């Protein structure tokens, strides 16, 4: 019998720095890399390398963000840092950089500021489960009473947004001093990583979640049935299993009689695969792009939901003017556009290009979605915004 291969891989966790401008997010990111590089657990990365974050596109939106990697004794981390406030908002709403947890940076000299609040609220809305606090600039604001007051304020704020403020770890440090190699402050970076290891939960791997495939195309194979193709978003599918076809039409069940990838027959397909799935007893006209194949009972179709959105600026290819209550664009979920109308929050009259807002959406046809589902807002095929479902209503 062949011996099982020794598995060296550590659990992979995605984190990111959040917090008010100039509170030290990028300096902390550089400090983590520099301190851990001394133990061979990261590549030393300079502040200016992180600060000139490259552009990337997610859901038709350009976002600047820097990605660094490091390891602790327990885990491997991918860490995202954004240069600008708008980049954070876009990043969280599009899910361009998925965050399993966050490191909230608060300057002990300033305490809680407007973007501190906004980032905590957004993290809550898009489902970041926990965060660790790094109270920065404690070398300057060295009065312990002042530090305690700031820590208390941060705990209260976290609690008010639904996080566990009472038990959230707070590390008192100085990112700049750690970056400069002062051993007293380097030790605080190790404390921070230990807190992240222990407080931020290991995410469920995509392959362990319930199966879901977004249908991109359909075809008939004479004598065998209907094949749907698309990317497996999560989970695993095996030949012989029953699936549900969800969205746009009433839910119907079907049995999988074959799976193909790159013209080869397979007995299973898993998260990340592009596969063709043969369905028994389903006619081609009964399935269409925009529906999903899913594990029975795991996802429901919805027409009405609440969402957090970002409206693109004119320079980003967005609208030139704001939109009002009742605006009817298309909502692009996974592989298809569905028209819907937007109801703004009570105290909002208009959403201007560059704004982020909480809205309620009512679609003309139900689509498979759940809390955390991402979508683009489009007008005539061009992206004018992006959003995350925060609550399904009906």
UniProtKB/Swiss-Prot annotation:
Residues 60-64 are annotated as: G2. It is found in: Cytoplasm. Residues 10-204 form the tr-type G domain. Residues 19-26 are annotated as: G1. Transmembrane segments: none annotated. PROSITE patterns: G_TR_1 (PS00301), G_TR_2 (PS51722). Its EC number is 3.6.5.3. One of its GO terms (cellular component) is cytoplasm. It catalyses: GTP + H2O = GDP + phosphate + H(+). Residues 81-84 are annotated as: G3. Residues 174-176 are annotated as: G5. Keywords: Cytoplasm, Elongation factor, GTP-binding, Hydrolase, Magnesium, Metal-binding, Nucleotide-binding, Protein biosynthesis. GO terms for biological process: translational elongation. Mg(2+) binds at residue 26. GTP hydrolase that promotes the GTP-dependent binding of aminoacyl-tRNA to the A-site of ribosomes during protein biosynthesis. HAMAP family: EF_Tu_B (MF_00118_B). Belongs to the TRAFAC class translation factor GTPase superfamily. Classic translation factor GTPase family. EF-Tu/EF-1A subfamily. This is Elongation factor Tu. The lineage of its organism: Bacteria, Bacillati, Mycoplasmatota, Mycoplasmoidales, Mycoplasmoidaceae.
């Amino acid at each position: 019998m062949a011996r099982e291969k020794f598995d060296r891989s550590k659990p992979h966790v995605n984190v990111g720095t959040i917090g008010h401008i100039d509170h030290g997010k990028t300096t902390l990111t550089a400090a983590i890399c520099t301190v851990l590089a001394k133990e061979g657990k990261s590549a030393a990365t300079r502040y200016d390398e992180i600060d000139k974050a490259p552009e990337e596109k997610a859901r038709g939106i350009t976002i600047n963000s820097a990605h660094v990697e490091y390891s602790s004794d327990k885990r491997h981390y991918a860490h995202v840092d954004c240069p600008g406030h708008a980049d954070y908002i876009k990043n969280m709403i599009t899910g361009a950089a998925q965050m399993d947890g966050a490191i909230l940076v608060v300057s002990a000299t300033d305490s809680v500021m407007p973007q501190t609040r906004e980032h905590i609220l957004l993290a809550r809305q898009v489902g970041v489960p926990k965060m660790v606090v790094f109270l920065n600039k404690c070398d300057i604001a060295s009065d312990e009473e002042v530090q305690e007051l700031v820590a208390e304020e941060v705990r209260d704020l976290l609690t008010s947004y639904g996080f566990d403020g009472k038990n959230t770890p707070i590390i008192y440090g100085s990112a700049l001093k750690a970056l400069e190699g002062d051993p007293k402050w380097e030790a605080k970076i190790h404390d921070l990583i230990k807190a992240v290891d222990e407080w931020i939960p290991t995410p469920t791997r995509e392959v362990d979640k319930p199966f879901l495939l977004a249908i991109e195309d359909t075809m008939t194979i004479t004598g065998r049935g209907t094949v749907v193709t698309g990317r497996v978003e999560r989970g695993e599918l095996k030949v012989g299993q029953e699936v549900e076809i969800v969205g746009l039409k009433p839910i119907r069940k079907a049995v999988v009689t074959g799976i193909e990838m790159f013209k080869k027959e397979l007995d299973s397909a898993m998260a990340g695969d592009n596969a063709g799935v043969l369905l028994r007893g389903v006619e081609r006209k009964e399935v269409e792009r925009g529906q999903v194949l899913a594990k029975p009972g795991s996802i429901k179709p919805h027409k009405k939901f609440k969402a957090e959105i970002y409206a693109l600026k004119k320079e980003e290819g967005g609208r030139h003017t704001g939109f009002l209550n009742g605006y009817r664009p298309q909502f692009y979920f996974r592989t298809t556009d569905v028209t819907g109308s937007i109801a703004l929050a009570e105290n909002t009259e208009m959403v201007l290009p560059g704004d982020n807002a909480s809205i309620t959406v009512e679609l003309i046809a139900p689509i498979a979605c759940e809390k955390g589902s991402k979508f683009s807002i489009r007008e005539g095929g061009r992206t004018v915004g992006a959003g995350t479902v925060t609550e399904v209503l009906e």
